[in-house]
Amino acid sequence: MEEWRIQDRMSQLADVLEAPEEHGVGSVNGLVDMLQLDLGVMVRLDADARPLLSAMKKVLTAGEMSGLDYSGLLSLLDTVVKLAPFETVLEVFSVEDIITALESDDQLVRTSCKVLAVSHPKDLFSTTRIMDVLLQLYFSQRTVPVNAVEDVFQSLCTDGLIRRRILENNYPLLREMRSTHDAILFSRYLVLMTILFRHIDRSEFQKELFVPTTEEVLDSLKKDIFLFINVAKYYRALLEYATDPGAAGGPRDWALSYILPVLHAFGHIYENKEKYIEVHSYARAYLFQLLRTVSYLEDMEVFRELDVKYLHISGDNPDVMHFMAIFNPMYLYRHHFDLLTSQVTVKPSFLPVLKNIVSCQETFEILKPALTASAILIMPYSEQMVLLGQLSSYPHSTEYLVQELPKVMSNLICNENGPISEPETIELRKKVFENLLLYSATVLNVWYEPLLDEYTNICSGKTSFVRTEVVDMYL
């Protein structure tokens, strides 16, 4: 859209916002929506945004106006401050304005957080009281727009000076929250520590702030089951960020020596699940997801120790099917080979396990003898598509599918089960085609053209037709 039109629309809205009662809230809401649409396709805003920002600030800091779409106005503010030069934004929203807003009602807190989240450079407010006030607000007993505050942390904690302001200048507050008995405030503390851990270097790491002890993990169960869930999620995040090679600054494996010993607390909780009944009822999935993350650590001996001491993976464990569906298949291959060979079967109830086994080339070799056309085609069609979606996701299993399972490929292309009415199954089948067509014509061989033709039919909504010449040739 032409710049002059944007400027005209912004000026028009600014004028209306100066006297919203005179023009009516319907007119204001309509102009806000139109400008939001106009700005939605822009990557920067060269027009002078100061009059509009000033008018928006005036309305947002005034008393609440009946019928005004404050959500839409805040969304527009978010868009404008992201597109406009930040020095322009600061001409309207001063440091004191932001602090005053943070100490006001929720609407003004959201307004100031919109501005803070896009501040440039990110360390701009590191020498002011803004982060101190924001932390006091975040850890206060009053109801606050938590997501808006956390958006600021997510944006600004990438900067070292901001992190220093939080970790050093506000150390007493963090220590207080570290030992609080308030489940809600401690959960917020864990969120903040998760955000910080993603970006800190070794010199910033403080064990007493970042690593809850074994006793604290066990105590969280006594306080609140949902607090325990947040602790389990926190430890999972620590492990993921500590071992992520793509993380900013590289993996933080130097933190593992502090994190790993505490994992025994979670193993103990699993082993004593009859004692911790609430875990089985409400937190089982979160505990298992944490254990799954441990199973994928490069040093498999960490998980092996938990397995031997607490998990006892075997055919006698009532959770064995769940374990086989989520734990690192390479770990299962190395330490529970006999379990895999004795338990693997191709049937709908085993589908979660099959998906996990297919993902690893070594465990897929164990599955091959059972992965026959008759075993697959006897499954309900939607389950067939789930399995084929997984088979078509990896080169080793795709090769087996296209070379060794012609009846399955034929059934996929010709849709011999008849018309599909369930939208989910239609999407699953379409995804299988998309997965397969990522491979070259050389890999797909005679199936390439039939797959491409049928995928075209799917996308255009045409009726499928049987390519008998391909089926007859390959069967």
Swiss-Prot record:
Q: Which Pfam families match?
A: HSM3_C, HSM3_N
One GO cellular component assignment for this chain's record is: cytosol
User: Keywords assigned by UniProt?
Assistant: Chaperone, Cytoplasm, DNA damage, DNA repair
Where in the cell is the protein located?
Answer: Cytoplasm
| The keyword Secreted is annotated on this UniProt entry | no
For this chain, the family text in UniProt reads: Belongs to the proteasome subunit S5B/HSM3 family.
- UniProt function note: Involved in DNA mismatch repair in slow-growing cells. Acts as a chaperone during the assembly of the 26S proteasome, specifically of the base subcomplex of the 19S regulatory complex (RC).
Name the UniProt record assigns to this protein: DNA mismatch repair protein HSM3
Q: What organism is the protein native to?
A: Eremothecium gossypii (strain ATCC 10895 / CBS 109.51 / FGSC 9923 / NRRL Y-1056) (Yeast)
